[in-house]
Amino acid sequence: MENRASGTTSNGETKPVCPAMEKVEEDGTLEREHWNNKMEFVLSVAGEIIGLGNVWRFPYLCYKNGGGAFFIPYLIFLFTCGIPVFFLETALGQYTNQGGITAWRRICPIFEGIGYASQMIVSLLNVYYIVVLAWALFYLFSSFTTDLPWGSCSHEWNTENCVEFQKANDSMNVTSENATSPVIEFWERRVLKLSDGIQHLGSLRWELVLCLLLAWIICYFCIWKGVKSTGKVVYFTATFPYLMLVVLLIRGVTLPGAAQGIQFYLYPNITRLWDPQVWMDAGTQIFFSFAICLGCLTALGSYNKYHNNCYRDCIALCILNSSTSFMAGFAIFSILGFMSQEQGVPISEVAESGPGLAFIAYPRAVVMLPFSPLWACCFFFMVVLLGLDSQFVCVESLVTALVDMYPRVFRKKNRREVLILIVSVISFFIGLIMLTEGGMYVFQLFDYYAASGMCLLFVAIFESLCVAWVYGAGRFYDNIEDMIGYKPWPLIKYCWLFFTPAVCLATFLFSLIKYTPLTYNKKYTYPWWGDALGWLLALSSMICIPAWSIYKLRTLKGPLRERLRQLVCPAEDLPQKNQPEPTAPATPMTSLLRLTELESNC
């Protein structure tokens, strides 16, 4: 199937015209940027994919789902879904030289909704993910003290049920069912001032508001100059967390009880593989930790030079990401093993996931260490950096998509900076609802529904179908060969064609069947309207794909067959193997002649 001439107008619509060059200097449009070198791209992607999930989610899932046995489903999903989709999105951005929306428009206009779905997810992610940074900053600032404030029960926010840390053989009576620890009271009564439900949002926590404002200011100045500033910032934000992680790892494995914790982390329980939930956890973890279906990889790849070897980069980055998750497990569970031994309780009682690990379990363990404020500062500084580069790359993804949709509007001097400011301000004000006394319940809604594995799996199904079956896996492989000089491992193509959509569809259907309404802390049940709001958040992204396809089919003129032909044909100015890249803009006359020639063929 040949290509059909098409182009992009200033308002973002696709029309069948002859290719035009993106660089339009006459109207003041700036040339699209590129990375100064490969290292900036690699570190930017590493900063995006290596985030909080590597530290607070993967180790817990590994322990929960059979220890070392969990690596079997994890590796299967890694090679059938993770690496293929990761490579697909990165190569797509590099090939089309476009962001997360227009890249899909240029290879298959009927599936442009994939881009809108991914940007809807990343927009919601931008609102709530940075709230974790606000919490981490609050803890970081609270750590600059001689005695950590969550280490004792002598503060004004503590209750009479507060029981300080102690070993099991201490004489104090701790049998009360209402007994709580100072770290939990610090988290719920000092940091969050948690209300009794989502129906009681209460007042704003102004200390957290200032922390959120600081986080957004840092995020803004990390990307305000585009890849020129992002490429420099990631040299620090993407590498320094590794230093912190190594320091915490060395400290953890030298503690008494560390071996017990690591044993719980890795000891294989093969019988857990018969539980379908283990496989679903492995699949969703791959999508979470590899930043798949968010448009971020497409945006970052679009700033590569055309002949960059993105295949080699993607394989190396995927290995780095999984290795980091594995190493983080040693750092976390060595500390949890120490805490388990010190308190004389089973490790199952101290193992936590998500915010519970970062703001309850680990702070509790830190108090037991000598020089505890130092280790608290190291840990929360690492959390801030891990979350920061993931956050600003997500914002960069959204901004890149908008700029590429409307280049004549935003690709002009200082307008991009204004756009980033607008996105940051809007996201900041929406995020304030999560800093109220009931804000934690709203945060959990966003985390459970808005960027859930269900949404990401749904988008991944259509991504693989679009590239492999509509655009053509063979054609895309030829495009990749034209870029990097050779064809990648053939298994990746077959994953796009068969394994990836099948595995994603099966996991998606299973997640629907096994769906359980959200609860907070296994105690609070959300009202019906809370779950309804959550489903609206989830559907807001998934509905974009079918809705866009129906909209384009209804608005285009002509017979259905002709409309379908126009909507599945890629842009004419996309470079093809053994064909020279376009070197000059087309005129209206050549556009008309070209359209006549291609009237019956794509």
Swiss-Prot record:
Regulation: Gamma-aminobutyric acid (GABA) transport is inhibited by beta-alanine, taurine, hypotaurine, beta-guanidinopropionic acid, 2,3-diaminopropionic acid, guvacine and nipecotic acid. Beta-alanine transport is inhibited by GABA. Taurine transport is inhibited by GABA, beta-alanine, SNAP-5114, nigericin, nipecotic acid and ouabain.
Extracellular side: 142-206
This protein's UniProt keywords: Cell membrane, Disulfide bond, Glycoprotein, Membrane, Neurotransmitter transport, Phosphoprotein, Symport, Transmembrane, Transmembrane helix, Transport
Record-listed Phosphothreonine modification sites: 587
Domain of life: Eukaryota
Transmembrane regions: 41-61, 68-88, 121-141, 207-227, 233-253, 282-302, 319-339, 366-386, 418-438, 453-473, 490-510, 528-548
Membrane protein topology class: Multi-pass membrane protein
Cell compartment(s), UniProt: Cell membrane; Basolateral cell membrane
Effect of inactivating the gene: Mutant animals are born at the expected Mendelian ratio. They appear normal, fertile, with a normal life span. Tissue taurine levels are altered, with 50% decrease in the liver and 20% increase in the brain.
Modified residues (Phosphoserine): 591
Tissue: Expressed at high levels in liver, followed by kidney and leptomeninges, and very low levels in the cerebellum (at protein level). In the brain, detected in some blood vessels (at protein level). In the kidney, expressed in the cortex, including parts of the proximal tubules, but not in the medulla (at protein level). In the liver, highest expression in periportal hepatocytes, with highest density at the vascular side (at protein level). Also detected at low levels in other organs, including skeletal muscle.
Catalytic activity, reaction form: 4-aminobutanoate(out) + chloride(out) + 2 Na(+)(out) = 4-aminobutanoate(in) + chloride(in) + 2 Na(+)(in); taurine(out) + chloride(out) + 2 Na(+)(out) = taurine(in) + chloride(in) + 2 Na(+)(in); beta-alanine(out) + chloride(out) + 2 Na(+)(out) = beta-alanine(in) + chloride(in) + 2 Na(+)(in); hypotaurine(out) + chloride(out) + 2 Na(+)(out) = hypotaurine(in) + chloride(in) + 2 Na(+)(in)
PROSITE patterns with a match to the protein in the record: NA_NEUROTRAN_SYMP_1, NA_NEUROTRAN_SYMP_2, NA_NEUROTRAN_SYMP_3
InterPro entries recorded: Na/ntran_symport (IPR000175), Na/ntran_symport_GABA_GAT2 (IPR002981), SNS_sf (IPR037272)
Cytoplasmic side, ranges: 1-40, 549-602
Disulfide bonds: 153-162
Chief site of localization: membrane
KW Translocase (keyword) present: no
Pfam families: SNF (PF00209)
UniProt GO MF annotations: amino acid binding; amino acid:sodium symporter activity; creatine transmembrane transporter activity; gamma-aminobutyric acid:sodium:chloride symporter activity; taurine:sodium symporter activity
Described function: Mediates sodium- and chloride-dependent transport of gamma-aminobutyric acid (GABA). Can also mediate transport of beta-alanine, taurine and hypotaurine and is the major taurine transporter in hepatocytes.
NCBIfam families the UniProt entry points to: Na_transp
Protein name: Sodium- and chloride-dependent GABA transporter 2
Native source organism of the sequence: Mus musculus
